[in-house]
Amino acid sequence: MSPAILNINNSGICLFQNDKVLYREIGIILNSDQGLLVGSKAMDSRRILPKNINYDFWGDLSESKIRSSLFSDYSSADLVSYQLKEVQQFINNNDPIIIIYPSYLDSENLSLLLGIANALDIQIITFIESSIAATKEKYFASKIIHLDIHLHGITASLMTDKKDVSVEESIFIEECGLFQLYDNWIKLITESCIEQLRYDPMHSAKTDQLLYNKVSKIIDEVTKKNKVTINIDSEDVSKIIEINSSAFIDAVNKNYRHLVTKLRSLFSRNENYVIQLTQQIAELPGLITLLESSFSCFVR
């Protein structure tokens, strides 16, 4: 049997083996009256109890105590350990695993992660940087730029496509992570509700959370239709609004343009480039079109 693989991306910590997903949860923790809750259970309260939420622990991996009154008893390493305990329940027969990690984790972070895993009796075979793990074909281009999206930003890795793929440089681009995009889409939907229904779904944390829970499905519809219909849940009755799909692209245009500006630092003259996207970032509405027009290179 092939070893299990743990892909570390806080937008979805994923354990899979033989092409089967065994565990997938967002890297977010809620400190509640019932104790710590991980993943989707925490996301259900992100807009209701924002001060009780921590979603920085994978990106700020250290043993220092967290500077937050509700998490002051914990370090980010403690929270990583807590989520890894959940992951461990899905590892078959305590099989050794391969870790795929994002470029923002350095050697010190990986050493700490190895120590956390050892303390939990999780055996790690090796660590593989995510951009290298994702590159499975030859593009016959001199340079590859790999993009992946996380909760707070996008990682961009510049790689050479020679005999063996290697990473030359990696940057972390803030202001264009999933949470920033979601917040802008929520703002668009809210403004449309006020305009079409004279109703503000953000007037209470509960209705705001109900709307937030729908965003990913709404964006999936945006990529398939010219116009989307959205059911807005209020306290008394469901209401319906319609928004042109192009408006969702316009709502995050500033984020996309920021990404393009930062990516230009990785390009140089007299080189052939391919921009390689993970599935999650490839599904963002309008992004591929913008990348193709901005860089005049193959995007896949």
PLM regions and their residue ranges:
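Gly/Thr-rich phosphate-binding beta-strand-loop-beta motif of the actin/hexokinase/Hsp70
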Residues: 1-32, 137-168, 221-227
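Structural motif
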Residues: 7-10, 100-104, 148-150, 277-282
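Conserved phosphate-binding loops in N-terminal lobes of ATP-dependent enzymes
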Residues: 11-100, 168, 222-226
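Active-site neighborhood for divalent-cation/phosphate handling
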Residues: 75-140
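Phosphate/pyrophosphate-binding loops at sites that engage ATP/ADP/AMP, CoA/4′-phosphopantetheine
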Residues: 84-97, 194-204, 256-275
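Glycine-rich phosphate-binding/hydrolytic loop that grips phosphoryl groups
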Residues: 130-142, 148, 178, 182-184, ...
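Phosphate-binding glycine-rich/basic clefts of nucleotide- and phosphate-handling proteins
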Residues: 160-245, 279
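Helical "lid/coupling" subdomains associated with nucleotide-phosphate turnover
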Residues: 221-300
